[in-house]
């Protein structure tokens, strides 16, 4: 609420210091600084820059038209948005489609269920096919998991889409009939096309962002970016903390795409999208704290993960699912990826 909006930076600082100070006392200020900088430079930086880039570019594309919210239209739009999430991110797809979905269903009385399914499909499970789609997969990609590895989830995604969209269709059909029976009727716009896009040139910048992420996994194997020892050329930050030149290239490409998107797009499009910086600011502040405070768990699991008694991947599946229901899925993913690695899964 209002308290969080006003004091969230202080809350993040408090919880971060709750880890940093005892850790510094036990292991030394230098080790504490290296630990914090390591996660911020090599995890948080690429994570937040990618979200920022997709947030900016998606905010410069608008969808207009005379589509009327009906069961069939809602199912089709949410289905398209689900697949779109894996390529422009769940945040980007949600930004792009939430306003059109709300607008085309504005004439209806019974419509709350539509946004629930929107969140299920577009804002969550839709990002499961690529590291662009969802931050946990991006963290896995940065740790060596191939970019297209998660494409194998497509049959699972498709099955869940069919189930959810079928449920949505019948729920929405029932609600739609109630609205019509109660006298609610949509406004018909005769001189307006069914659907109209503005700012479509921003697709170029989305492609640049996707290319930047893919290149961050390809360039480290190119000899040009390696030193004499065969290691990726890096920029020293502090102690043992280094920023790989390939990560810097990724960050620069994404920020350049975001900058060019703003420079080449009419500001009226952002006004139509009610574009503000509030959402990305909140994510940026919150995840600094998340990345820092999950370091103790990652360290413990690296050294003692095999002692947890987990002997099969299915056990991790159920535990991660349970934890992700009330924790963010990114730290949950990282914790159990580390656990699985320590156990040789």
Feature locations, PLM:
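Membrane-interfacial helix-loop connectors
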Residues: 21-24, 85, 95-110, 114-116, ...
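Helix-loop-helix module between adjacent transmembrane segments
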Residues: 55-65, 80-93, 122-130, 157-168, ...
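C-terminal ends of transmembrane helices
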Residues: 1-3, 54-69, 102-105, 170-174, ...
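Juxtamembrane and boundary regions of transmembrane helices in multi-pass small-molecule transporters
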Residues: 109-110, 129-130, 139, 148-197
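Interfacial loop-to-helix junctions that mark the boundaries of transmembrane helices
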Residues: 2-10, 31-45, 147-156, 193-197, ...
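Transmembrane alpha-helix boundary signature
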Residues: 20-40, 55-69, 83-96, 296-304, ...
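Transmembrane helical segments that form the transport core of multi-pass membrane transport proteins
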Residues: 206-343
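Hydrophobic core segments of alpha-helical transmembrane domains in multi-pass membrane transport
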Residues: 13-25, 51-59, 81, 158-170, ...
């Amino acid at each position: 609420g209002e308290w969080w909006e006003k004091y969230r930076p202080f809350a993040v600082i408090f919880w971060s210091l709750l880890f940093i100070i005892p850790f510094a006392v036990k292991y030394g200020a230098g080790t504490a600084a290296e630990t914090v900088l390591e996660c911020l430079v090599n995890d948080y930086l690429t994570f937040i820059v990618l979200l920022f880039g997709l947030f900016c570019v998606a905010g410069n594309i608008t969808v207009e038209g005379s589509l009327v919210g009906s069961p069939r239209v809602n199912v089709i739009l949410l289905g398209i948005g689900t697949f779109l999430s894996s390529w422009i991110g769940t945040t980007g797809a949600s930004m792009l489609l939430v306003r059109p979905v709300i607008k085309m269903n504005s004439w209806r009385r019974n419509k709350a269920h539509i946004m629930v399914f929107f969140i299920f499909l577009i804002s969550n499970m839709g990002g499961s096919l690529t590291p662009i789609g969802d931050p946990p997969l991006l963290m896995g990609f940065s740790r060596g998991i191939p970019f297209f590895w998660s494409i194998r989830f497509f049959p699972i995604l498709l099955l869940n889409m069919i189930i959810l969209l079928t449920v949505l269709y019948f729920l929405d059909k029932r609600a739609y009939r109630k609205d019509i029976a109660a006298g609610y009727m949509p406004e018909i716009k005769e001189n307006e096309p069914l659907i109209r896009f503005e700012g479509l040139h921003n697709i170029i910048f989305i492609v640049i962002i996707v290319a930047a992420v893919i290149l961050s996994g390809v360039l480290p194997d190119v000899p040009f970016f390696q030193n004499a020892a065969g290691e990726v050329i890096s920029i020293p930050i502090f102690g043992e903390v280094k920023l790989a030149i390939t990560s810097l290239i990724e960050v620069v490409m994404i920020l350049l795409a975001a900058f060019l998107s703003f420079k080449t797009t009419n500001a009226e499009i952002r006004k139509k999208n009610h574009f503000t910086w509030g959402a990305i600011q909140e994510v940026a502040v919150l995840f600094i704290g998340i990345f820092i405070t999950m370091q103790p768990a990652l360290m413990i699991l690296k050294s003692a993960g095999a002692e947890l008694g987990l002997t099969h991947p299915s056990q991790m599946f159920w535990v991660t699912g349970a934890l992700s229901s009330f924790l963010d899925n990114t730290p949950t993913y990282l914790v159990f990826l580390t656990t699985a690695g320590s156990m040789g899964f």
